[in-house]
Amino acid sequence: MNTVYERLNALQIKLPEIPPPVVDGYVPLFEPFVRTGNLIYLSGRLAKKDGKPYSGKLGQQITTAEGRQAARDVAIEVLATLQTALGDLNKVKRIVKMTVLVNSAPDFTESHEVANGASKLLCEVFGERGAHARTTLVGRRSHSAPVWKSR
């Protein structure tokens, strides 16, 4: 497959319209994306279920599989935001970095599996251009590691 859109079609993904980032009447004082030179920085997106912010903690009310799907769904919204910013997803030269914030129970250790939902989608859609650096922030580190550092 040659284009991002052919890959999206093969994955049966239709990009959504990007709703304004308003939650419960709160209107943020930031933009959904900012372009500077050849880089585009995206604001965070909340996971949603049935059009409303997804609520709960991984390892309590939400399973790893549900979290992985939620991360994938957020990545689809990210693609829609990039589409809005660029007009054409084929213009994306590289996904450089992704940060995933995971709300989890204290004993949940599979945050990396949740984040993989988004990472896998970006690689499926962009191929090698979708391979990226990633930071996953949680209350507890994967593999119970006591220290972690991002570069």
What are these regions (language model features)?
Residues 1-76, 80, 84-96, 104-151:
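N-terminal presequence-like segments and the immediate start of the first folded domain
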